[in-house]
Amino acid sequence: MIARAAGEALVQEGERIVAARGPLAVGEAVVTTAGRLPFKGVIHAVGPQQGIGREEERLVQALGAAFLRAHERGFESVSFPAVSSGIFAVPLEVCARAYVRAVREFMRAHPDTSLKTLRLVLVDGPLVALVRQELGRKA
């Protein structure tokens, strides 16, 4: 969906990155052009699949890498989908903990970051409820 909206420039840049360095590993993130999208860039992060082990840690790592790439580029805001909760089948409870943990850990480690807004874009009602519950817990 993002690639279609962004256009061929994003796809071609992604192909160049993979040709130069190989596919991203779980926990890694890179930035490409946003193409036709009205953004400074698109961050590509690889989250874990259920069953590979340490899913929560690896998801926190992937999101942290994405936030770091945004910080390095001076982005002021970033929106991210429910990474690993769909076809990668990581349980929603694990995803909710990881999303909240990743944001808290990144903000603690980078209090001077240019990032002012971190948006989690959720379309799944149960996941929204779980993230709200996690946000209510003490860090």
What kind of feature is each model-predicted range?
Residues 1-72:
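Glycine-/small-residue-enriched capping loops at alpha/beta junctions
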Residues 49-139:
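Phosphate/ribose-phosphate-bearing ligand recognition and processing surfaces
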